[in-house]
Amino acid sequence: MSEREQRIRIAVVDDHEMFRAGVIATLQPYFDVVGQAADVEGSVAMIAQTKPDVVLLDVHVPGGENGGGAEILTKSRAYSPNTVFLALSVSDSPQDVGSVIRAGAQGYVCLLY
């Protein structure tokens, strides 16, 4: 496969297993899903190991120092500096949006039901 034909490598971070499974099932035909995690520590380790092109990142993730997605982003940068982070959340709180954008997320998608 040529470099131009290489599929984008994606990781999914969310503490809800069913949501992760749905996102992964939807993306797998089009992207290489290289990892998934449910908490801060597991996410940082997975990102350091897999170095994905893109991380789809929940804002509210347990563990760590209670920093959630912003903490994952900050801690992962040293291990995977070229990874693009896109936050996904049901929260439209300005504090939540601001925390991950300030930490370096490239975008924020609000999942309203």
Where do the language-model regions lie?
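Non-catalytic signal-transmission and effector/linker regions of two-component phosphorelay proteins
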Residues: 1-9
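Two-component/phosphorelay signaling modules centered on CheY-like receiver
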Residues: 17-35
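Acidic, metal-coordinating helix/loop segments flanking the phosphotransfer/catalytic sites
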Residues: 38-54
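Short amphipathic alpha-helix used as the core "switch/output" element in two-component signaling
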Residues: 45, 66-82
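Active-site residues of response regulator receiver
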Residues: 58-60, 89
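A short, hydrophobic beta-strand element within the central beta-sheet of small alpha/beta folds
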Residues: 82-92
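Conserved small/polar residues in nucleotide/adenosyl-binding loops
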Residues: 113
